[in-house]
Amino acid sequence: MAKHHPLTDWLPTSKKEMEAKGWDEADVILFSGDAYVDHPSFGAAVVGRILEAEGLRVAIVPQPNWRDDLRDFRKLGRPRLFFGVSAGAMDSMVNKYTANRRLRSEDAYTPDRRSDMRPDYPTIVYTRILKELFPDVPVIVGGIEASLRRLTHYDYWQDKLLPGILYQSGADLLIYGMGELPLHEIAQRLIAGEPFDSLKSIRQIAYLVPKGKTPVPCENDRHLFSHEECLSDKRKQAQNFREIEIQSNRYEADRILQAVGDSTIVVNPPFPPMSTAQIDQSFDLPYTRLPHPRYKGKIISAYEMIKHSVNVHRGCFGGCAFCTISAHQGKFIASRSEASVLREVKEITEMEDFKGYLSDVGGPSANMYKMQGYDLSICKRCKKPSCIHPNVCPNLNADHRPLLDLLRRIDKNPKIKKSFIGSGVRMDLLLHNYKDKVLKKAADEYTEDLIVKHVSGRLKVAPEHSSDRVLNLMRKPPFRQFAEFTKRFQRINEAHGLRQQLIPYFISSHPGCTEEDMAELAILTKKLDFKLEQIQDFTPTPMTLATEMYYTGYHPYTLQPVYTAIKKEEKMRQHMFFFWYKREEADKIRRELHRIGRPDLIAKLFDRTTSSRNDRHTPPSTQPRKSKSKSRHS
């Protein structure tokens, strides 16, 4: 039976709601670029519930108006301890603009998808306003925008290097990564009466100090090239990124320092990966799992997408060059207990609009639940950004049995008709030739269960490209694995009398990719009988390897030059190869193949005899039909 929630079950968003709780002031006031949804997938709710669990009174101002007399920033008054600021669940510029730098018409994190409810760079805008209105109140920033912009970074939308967001915003502290552990310690210290300045010794915190007044040196401090040096030398920016990524992926990282202007940014090492008990505690907080009643009658699309889904772990050890997950969540997996997951599933089944279908049981990648190194002492010495590229690490315990057991226990709930896996699946973990027969059997069982029991007719996978040279730059497995997985998908479908579809995702204009590579991609996918729809142009986002290659023109680990399509016309020429089957693109593609000196590819691409409809190895069941674009994980 659905539970009725009184208004006081949510964090207060107005003075009236604070009074209903008997408060005359809040200890902490949060400002968020997203609508307030009280759910563990929405960062402001998580931060608020964590601080509330520490005994603090927390209020939230979602999507404040920054263009009027700033009454939204004043309405709850001055907090006793600090303001917290987050741009929201996405970097605001990714949220607001397309890969072509055009303003998006919709915002999934805003009621009724309105696109005018947040500024560019809310972290900076909100913080500057708060500092102007309440100059003596500390401001702590966090969330993915602040986290991935904590040091000098390339901003695609301004097409230039920007300094760390602390320097731009004037915030007092920055929490990077997932915030539960630093927030717990911040709350404990402030409740104990320690001064705000003492917080600078906490792990996973970044802060500014005047140049020349750096904190007591640590034995292994990592001093980056200054922001100004990076502005004058792109190779230095590339070298900086290499050090940042190495430290981001270490179990026990070093402190990072970078000079900018008259200040130095200090980034303390992160906390160790969360334990199962710690991550359970975060997910088990008393969320209503609903949007705030202020949005009654309005639709928040991001919530609609995830309201019947369950996140079972955090972190990803894939290390994809274009992905920010490992930079923000880390490469070490933090998994929830079965008991915690099953409690959440039970809560979902009791929701009024639940019809028996879980939309996703997954995480950043679908199949990494409870995976870690056999010998953690080896992991603690490791500096590699990926545990599976170029090969699966022999120290990785990639056992799919815990995930299989969890899925089967979920499906035993009598109110569950079907549990889907909507997160992206790592094919390389399923196809790896495990020496341990138990691991091989478990991977095969998971593959079959996935295809037979957990697919809604369409399985999303992300080969991303067909060129092994480009895939190596992406830190993705070779294309032959996609062909192998396609055959396995076909065999399992045939064995069970199913006609499901495989939906591959591809990227154009990734660093290292040429028009010739795109032509080869078109030919290979044609042979596999795919007419691609789920495609995207590469968008540089802060703190990824691919973005550094795009901006600097060098690979940060080798300092060798890397070609990248930068100009709009170059990117469009690559993108059109996805649509070789459209009549209006065919002549353009023919002309382009002549221009790049590869007319020999024309026959392979447009000769009907090369169609894979004559290839008995690829049945119609793998032919994707036209569909609306969906978000995906790498």
Curated annotation (Swiss-Prot):
Binding residues annotated for [4Fe-4S] cluster, in chain numbering: 316, 320, 323
InterPro entries: Elp3/MiaA/NifB-like_rSAM (IPR006638), Methylthiotransferase_CS (IPR020612), rSAM (IPR007197), rSAM_horseshoe (IPR023404), UPF0313 (IPR022946), UPF0313_C (IPR024560), UPF0313_N (IPR013704)
HAMAP family: UPF0313
Cofactor note: Binds 1 [4Fe-4S] cluster. The cluster is coordinated with 3 cysteines and an exchangeable S-adenosyl-L-methionine.
UniProt domain Radical SAM core: residue ranges: 302-582
Swiss-Prot/TrEMBL cofactor(s): [4Fe-4S] cluster
Chain segments annotated as coiled-coil in the UniProt record: none
Keyword Cytoplasm: no
UniProt-recorded Gene Ontology molecular function terms: 4 iron, 4 sulfur cluster binding; catalytic activity; iron ion binding
Region (Disordered): 607-634
Keyword line: 4Fe-4S, Iron, Iron-sulfur, Metal-binding, S-adenosyl-L-methionine
Entry similarity comment: Belongs to the UPF0313 family.
Composition bias, Basic residues: 625-634
Protein name as it appears in the record: UPF0313 protein PG_0934
